[in-house]
């Protein structure tokens, strides 16, 4: 049985994809403001948010709490449970990108490179938020297929395509 600390610092499984997409929308907004207004310190805000979500899911992240407790309950959408481990992996990738941007800004004074990294993060978060395409989840599935991530990490998500709705069969003459 998990200790209270282990339970607190665990990632939910499953997660509500609607909350994940709204949270990604918040990342898009923060990233766009950072780029458009040239506010490099927002890369640290993004990194802190990703770190909190990697450590404890939405429990500590102000952005995820806003999404899960304020925004999503007011939307006319049903919860959509999806596997948690790929989403956590995607949060880890977001952490890597946001930390890389912060380091490029503040440790290496490489603004252009930092804004390119932030732009890539905004692009990936836009795909998740607008289209429901989680690049980190696809990478997770690929790493599972290659055997880098063992199947027991997420037995239900080894093949993310198996969980997609199948198109309705075409009936001739209809």
List the model feature ranges, each with a label.
Residues 1-173:
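Membrane-interfacial helix-loop segments of redox and metal-homeostasis proteins
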């Amino acid at each position: 049985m998990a200790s209270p600390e282990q339970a607190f610092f665990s990632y939910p499984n499953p997660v509500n994809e609607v909350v994940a997409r709204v949270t990604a929308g918040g990342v898009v907004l923060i990233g766009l403001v950072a780029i458009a207004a040239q506010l490099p310190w927002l890369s640290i805000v993004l990194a802190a948010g990703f770190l909190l979500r990697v450590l404890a899911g939405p429990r500590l992240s102000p952005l995820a709490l806003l999404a899960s407790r304020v925004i999503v309950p007011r939307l006319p959408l049903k919860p959509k449970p999806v596997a948690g481990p790929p989403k956590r992996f995607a949060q880890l990738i977001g952490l890597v990108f946001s930390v890389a941007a912060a380091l490029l800004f503040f440790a290496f004074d490489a603004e252009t490179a930092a804004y390119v990294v932030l732009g890539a993060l905004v692009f990936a978060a836009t795909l998740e938020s607008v289209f429901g395409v989680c690049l980190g989840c696809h990478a997770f599935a690929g790493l599972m297929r290659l055997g880098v991530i063992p199947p027991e990490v997420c037995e239900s998500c080894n093949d993310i395509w198996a969980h997609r709705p199948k198109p309705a069969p075409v009936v001739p003459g209809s």
